[in-house]
Amino acid sequence: MPAGGGLWRGPRGHRPGHHGGAGLGRLWPAPHHAAAARGAVALALLLLALAAAPPCGAAAVTRAASASPTPGTGATPNDVSAEASLEEIEAFSPGPSEAPDGEYGDLDARTAVRAAATERDRFYVCPPPSGSTVVRLEPEQACPEYSQGRNFTEGIAVLFKENIAPHKFKAHIYYKNVIVTTVWSGSTYAAITNRFTDRVPVPVQEITDVIDRRGKCVSKAEYVRNNHKVTAFDRDENPVEVDLRPSRLNALGTRGWHTTNDTYTKIGAAGFYHTGTSVNCIVEEVEARSVYPYDSFALSTGDIVYMSPFYGLREGAHGEHIGYAPGRFQQVEHYYPIDLDSRLRASESVTRNFLRTPHFTVAWDWAPKTRRVCSLAKWREAEEMTRDETRDGSFRFTSRALGASFVSDVTQLDLQRVHLGDCVLREASEAIDAIYRRRYNSTHVLAGDRPEVYLARGGFVVAFRPLISNELAQLYARELERLGLAGVVGPAAPAAARRARRSPGPAGTPEPPAVNGTGHLRITTGSAEFARLQFTYDHIQAHVNDMLGRIAAAWCELQNKDRTLWSEMSRLNPSAVATAALGQRVSARMLGDVMAISRCVEVRGGVYVQNSMRVPGERGTCYSRPLVTFEHNGTGVIEGQLGDDNELLISRDLIEPCTGNHRRYFKLGSGYVYYEDYNYVRMVEVPETISTRVTLNLTLLEDREFLPLEVYTREELADTGLLDYSEIQRRNQLHALKFYDIDRVVKVDHNVVLLRGIANFFQGLGDVGAAVGKVVLGATGAVISAVGGMVSFLSNPFGALAIGLLVLAGLVAAFLAYRHISRLRRNPMKALYPVTTKTLKEDGVDEGDVDEAKLDQARDMIRYMSIVSALEQQEHKARKKNSGPALLASRVGAMATRRRHYQRLESEDPDAL
């Protein structure tokens, strides 16, 4: 080692530590990763270094710079005090320094720290552990003996699992929605006092003869309630066939048809209760589902049918469960349904089941159970599956693509004992044949005539079909030709021979056929070439398996030994041990036999290191770690010290007596910051140090990610129930929108209702009553129209304004007339001759100017004018009295007096004057 010492660094990302007094010792790493082998090697090197490393010199010599700059020529000037020369530097800008080697003295600390910071080297704040979270070292465990696999067989496999998914099929439900509404009719309003809704089934004959033949439905519903047969008519009218129209809205996977959008409500004469009936024929195509043991099925409407969907009248299906009377079920062969949207008949016939329940009729296509359902479901296909026989007498199936192994007995599974397991061989053969044609058709041959089925642990069923390479198959063929058995055993001989040699015959399988009646056929290999090839293959296989078994056992023993090292190191530096074990930055302290930990928080704000490590105001006292300031989560500037491995301490308690010839290197970011005599000098890059990493030159295996191997997906688990309640709620909320128009408002005209009632009354009187009714209805209609016109005119704002103005004008005229009459009564002369009376009033009247004779004449004239007015009134009364009936009576009386020779007397006496 050179006299100046050497700057040693541990592997990248490891926690450094220092050894020695005033001189600079070696910086050795503590474990950082969780890998047990790497941790053990690092700990062993650390213990050896601490025990055997000699002390180094005080000077740190690097490969890049020949000499260190003197204090005062670096970042801090001599003529500035320690407090004034605190140059805060930021350590977050990545990228190496652009300054050449040897010129670090001309750079400030800010530039050097920026050049050292990288993305991987971040700063952390570690709170002290409180003990709420503890970690224990795993105790030693007994190492298992890994059995070696032997007799490997390559092939293609298909994995099956238990089928938890329900059996789904399409079904049609037919029902008539009967709504009976009772309404109280008022003079200007209508109120619903009762509403009764019921679903009634559609007869099967109507479905087959009307709905599935002409796309129509009868507007009449006949059903049984309270053990009585009742009938309902749509709109209380005679039944007719109504076209089925598509529903307004449909949920996903469902369709619907109905006959009407409206609910009939009868609004009759005012003051009475009226009842109206609405019959809406509805056909819905829904999803039905049934779960094992398939003794009932549920519809997406929420209805449950208590019978097996596989119940039928042929092929033994009558043994399935049914919970209804036989008369409610009907099966129709060669049935041709129609598409209610296009009105097209199906091209192929089906066997359709019909079941009439108290509230609906359900129909679905029947098929045997064995063709529709299976108790096992295909899970995964393994194009490369390896089967090996373990020493405990079991088969181990390993799939590299799946990253999983399945262990089973050597005895094949008898699928006849598996209920509804006929699909396994069929689906497995189809999948294996497809994989073989796509991948192995030119390089391998299939062994056997069908897949071998095994029950693996965990309830999985493995359908395995061995593969033989073409070269090996040719060797088998040559051996058979040599023995003269090629024509006896046929093309399946290579697979049989390979199975007979490599694995014992499974229990319960049929014995091989006898040859010439002398015993069982036993095929052996006699070719030396084949034997050598087989021996070489078996030898290499056994050697590799034995080596892998030893490595596995040694790995387990190494884990137990590493536990002792971890336990001892946890007493020296629990934080480093916990960080390496957990794989994330934590702070730890021992609590007896366990470690209390707290997670370190990454500092995302700026981190600044100060140039001086001397304590201001205290001579002879210095800080043992550099001073830093940083920001964290917007809390402002925090003052602290730089801890080990980029840890930021929130206190400044680490002090020591100042010593001469002080030289220290501290980890900062991805490099090291160098202090001399407690002053910053420069930044030391990682490439300038000597690495203690011992590189192991090996070719590693390819990286492999282990992902969760889901047996049942979330969708499969959510779809296991008999009822899908979310779908039921969605359907119930959508029912009114599908089959009824909720936006349409029917406005009732009470006049029309009155005329309709009068018309119905006269129509009940026959033809004469109908004729009279037309006349009466015409007159009534005219009156209603006139009144309606007036009401409409008055309801118009302009009409109401005009009427108001006319009324106001009449009131003003009446007031003026009343005032004029009052003036006439009070002072007639003033009212008749206002000018004359006004002049007399202004000029005044002297007694000498009045002519008494003219005054008497004026009085006489006024008196005679009054007499003339009275005579005219009497004459007017007389004429009015003699007009009409009075005049007729006077005329008759005059005729009678004339016949009796009476003469009229003079009404005035000529001698009276």
From Swiss-Prot:
One Gene Ontology term from the biological process aspect of the record: symbiont entry into host cell
Disordered as annotated region, ranges: 1-24, 496-519
Location(s), subcellular: Virion membrane; Host cell membrane; Host endosome membrane; Host Golgi apparatus membrane
TM spans (from-to): 798-818
Residues spanned by motif Internalization motif: 902-905
Name of a matching Pfam family: Glycoprot_B_PH1
Topological domains, Virion surface: 60-797
Superkingdom assignment: Viruses
Ranges in coiled-coil conformation: none
InterPro entries, per the entry: Glycoprot_B_PH1, Glycoprot_B_PH2, Glycoprot_B_PH2_sf, Glycoprotein_B_ecto_C, Herpes_Glycoprot_B
Stretches of the chain found on the membrane's Intravirion side: 819-913
Disulphide linkage map: C126-C600, C143-C556, C217-C281, C374-C423, C622-C658
Region (Involved in fusion and/or binding to host membrane): 183-189, 268-275
Keywords recorded for this protein, A-Z: Disulfide bond, Glycoprotein, Host cell membrane, Host endosome, Host Golgi apparatus, Host membrane, Host-virus interaction, Membrane, Signal, Transmembrane, Transmembrane helix, Viral attachment to host cell, Viral envelope protein, Virion, Virus entry into host cell
GO CC annotations, alphabetized: host cell endosome membrane; host cell Golgi membrane; host cell plasma membrane; membrane; viral envelope; virion membrane
Residue spans of biased composition, Low complexity class: 496-506
UniProt modification remark: A proteolytic cleavage by host furin generates two subunits that remain linked by disulfide bonds.
Its job: Envelope glycoprotein that forms spikes at the surface of virion envelope. Essential for the initial attachment to heparan sulfate moieties of the host cell surface proteoglycans. Involved in fusion of viral and cellular membranes leading to virus entry into the host cell. Following initial binding to its host receptors, membrane fusion is mediated by the fusion machinery composed at least of gB and the heterodimer gH/gL. May be involved in the fusion between the virion envelope and the outer nuclear membrane during virion egress.
Similarity comment: Belongs to the herpesviridae glycoprotein B family.
Complex and partners: Homotrimer; disulfide-linked. Binds to heparan sulfate proteoglycans. Interacts with gH/gL heterodimer.
Name of the protein described by the UniProt record: Envelope glycoprotein B
Source species of the chain: Suid herpesvirus 1 (strain Indiana-Funkhauser / Becker) (SuHV-1)
Name of the coding gene: gB
